[in-house]
Amino acid sequence: AIKRPIFVTGLVRTGTTALHRLLGADPAHQGLHMWLAEYPQPRPPRETWESNPLYRQLDAQFTQHHAENPGYTGLHFMAAYELEECWQLLRQSLHSVSYEALAHVPSYADWLSRQDWTPSYCRHRRNLQLIGLNDAEKRWVLKNPSHLFALDALMATYPDALVVQTHRPVETIMASMCSLAQHTTEGWSTKFVGAQIGADAMDTWSRGLERFNAARAKYDSAQFYDVDYHDLIADPLGTVADIYRHFGLTLSDEARQAMTTVHAESQSGARAPKHSYSLADYGLTVEMVKERFAGL
């Protein structure tokens, strides 16, 4: 059984990745490692991963990607061994906002907005049961901006879920969101560039927040916790402690130490955040963004 799993969600670039990896560092928790999202199977002992051919294949791909795109690691560090979003599990059912975040696909976006995601989350749950077979006693910690679009399906599948929503003024992150989409898809399309990326991002993410806010109002507020991005950056471990306190969880000394190590690693070397961008690059202004997201 999967009991009281933690789901981190929020707009892209609001600190979801940093918070997810901090929470996942707790030895009492388990998360979705990139290679197991790609190749779902019962999680083998950590010391055997480097000899697993599937792990080695994906690790080699990321090593090549890092070498060919040295600037990308500072935007969003990815590796076969790292905790990652559960978008790959939802993609198994073709229900994922990642598609419209990486291409101009208005007909797909329209189709997705009318779908019931519940079967996708049931499959998501079965994947977690498979992957966590050897660690059934550990609490799952998961993260995906797609959860904004399907809270009802998530709660129907995981009725005791603990949901953490991250927040940051949208006008300060929209350019960053667009820049990430641009760098991820460089050379893929002549359509999904510049102002088209900006327009699509505005449509997609305003719709997601509208849906999430409307759905959230129906559930027990005790199952939700809000994190301000600036609080997370100023005091990462203090923010985590507040989350544990709200949900009645125990934060052990071992967990604190592991989180301290993870935070230090995230600020160093290739992982250190490096990002420059402008709203004007994507046909947007601060006023346009504020107007679209007013009240969300």
What are these regions (language model features)?
Residues 1, 104-121, 128, 132-135, ...:
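PAPS-dependent sulfotransferases, especially Golgi type II membrane carbohydrate sulfotransferases
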Residues 7-26:
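Glycine-rich phosphate-binding P-loop
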